[in-house]
């Protein structure tokens, strides 16, 4: 489900096939004409749209799309220089924010493990502002095995951790091909992923704060280690 004209527009630009759409009956958005050429479009007032979408303030357009084919890890890694891998990040809003951060800062793709939220879940898609349909993403059943395989393919694997013995992010010279691994808040990355990593890095913190929200930490890491 894509909500809002920006997200619906990005879905269409990404080649996604709409099933149907619901638009504001009083003020149909400009994108309505494009949707009419592709799928049934229904119109409803704010009360109807709120009932259908369960949003207190519904968007002017909501569209259902066929789910696009998900890429494989191998397909994404083949041409990538910068990848984010997340483990056990089960909040769809965090996944959406991570996607938007990675896309906006020039990274090439996202890998999520089996316990992380779906990048195309309704909330992930909304928070990413539709970039979940633009940034390639893949799912892996075994994050540690994937990390080990990517290391064998020439990627430097950087595990972000609050561990005080890790290398400060400021002191890291960005390598040519890099995977940054992010874990769930409080729990962090699993021992297996940490063991498979080639580098452990930390964001220097102050005032007794040990770590940041995973999406905020991803944004900082993606900026500091962006491709040059």
Residue positions per predicted region:
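RNA substrate-binding interface of SAM-dependent RNA methyltransferases
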Residues: 41, 69-70, 75-165
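Short, structured interface segments
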Residues: 60-70
């Amino acid at each position: 489900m894509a909500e809002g004209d920006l997200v619906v527009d990005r879905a269409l630009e990404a080649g996604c096939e709409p099933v149907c759409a619901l638009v504001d009956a009083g003020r149909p958005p400009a994108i309505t004409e494009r949707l009419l050429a592709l799928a049934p479009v229904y119109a409803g007032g704010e009360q109807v749209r709120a009932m259908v979408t369960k949003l207190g303030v519904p968007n002017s357009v909501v569209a259902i799309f066929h789910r696009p084919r998900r890429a494989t890890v191998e397909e994404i890694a083949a041409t990538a220089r910068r990848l984010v891998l997340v483990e056990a990040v089960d909040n769809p809003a965090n996944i959406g924010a991570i996607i938007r951060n990675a896309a906006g800062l020039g990274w090439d793709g996202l890998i999520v493990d089996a316990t992380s939220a779906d990048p195309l879940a309704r909330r992930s898609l909304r928070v990413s502002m539709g970039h979940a349909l633009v940034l390639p993403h893949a799912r892996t059943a075994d994050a540690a095995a994937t990390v080990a395989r990517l290391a064998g393919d020439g990627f430097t694997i950087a595990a972000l951790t609050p561990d005080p013995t890790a290398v400060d992010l400021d002191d890291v010279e960005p390598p040519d091909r890099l995977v940054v691994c992010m874990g769930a808040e409080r729990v962090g990355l699993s021992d297996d992923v940490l063991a498979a990593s080639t580098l452990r890095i930390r964001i220097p913190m102050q005032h007794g704060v040990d770590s940041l929200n995973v999406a905020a930490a991803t944004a900082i890491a993606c900026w500091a280690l962006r491709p040059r």
